[in-house]
Amino acid sequence: MSEVLDLSAEARERAGKGASRAIRREGRVPAVIYGEKQEPASIHVEEKVLMKLLHTGHFFNSVVMLDVGGKKVRTLPKDVQFHPVTDRPLHVDFLRIGEHTKVNVNVPVHFKDEELSPGLKRGGVLNVVIHDLGLSVDAAEIPEEIVISLKGLEVGESIHLSQVALPKGASAQDHEDITIATIVAPSALKSAEGEEAAEAGEEAAEG
């Protein structure tokens, strides 16, 4: 299960661009808490602490417990706006949730048992189609990752959504049996990349 992240916050008295710029100059990031049929709450958080949480790699599929003036608020991060040049966070949206609220999250997909794949042993290449899997899951049971075994996979074989073991109580947001990954021959991969490059060249020539 993904760990619960803690983040201190302070209520934001003033709104507007001028107030937000002033907050950022103090090393803080404006944010808002919304949802659960309650009024949105304007807050701000420390930029350095927020950056540490963003660098965990699982910020968006973790419950974040906000401490707003001593009051604990259970939330799920929904969006972070970044500066286009400096890449510093400009604003954060937090969705207020209950302990067992059903939430939609994108969970990273990881693979194991590469050494047990005959296709990879013969020089095949793992072509990952889906890097994050959209799940609908209990907020208290959000997985940190979905691990998929490559055991027994030959060149030309694929892993589909229907073959992936999801955590108990979780369901995929995508109802189609999408392809997660495929073992391809190196020549097939190079051919596909060559075709894409050729198409890009043709489009550039036409444009």
From Swiss-Prot:
GO cellular component: cytosolic large ribosomal subunit
Pfam families: Ribosomal_L25p (PF01386), Ribosomal_TL5_C (PF14693)
Matching InterPro entries: Rbsml_bL25/Gln-tRNA_synth_N (IPR020056), Ribosomal_bL25/Gln-tRNA_synth (IPR011035), Ribosomal_bL25_b-dom (IPR020057), Ribosomal_bL25_C (IPR037121), Ribosomal_bL25_long (IPR001021), Ribosomal_bL25_short (IPR020055), Ribosomal_L25_dom (IPR029751), Ribosomal_uL5_bac-type (IPR020930)
Keyword Ribosomal protein: yes
GO terms (BP aspect): translation
Protein's UniProt keywords contain Transferase: no
Secretion signal span: none
Domain of life: Bacteria
Family per record: Belongs to the bacterial ribosomal protein bL25 family. CTC subfamily.
Name this polypeptide is given: Large ribosomal subunit protein bL25
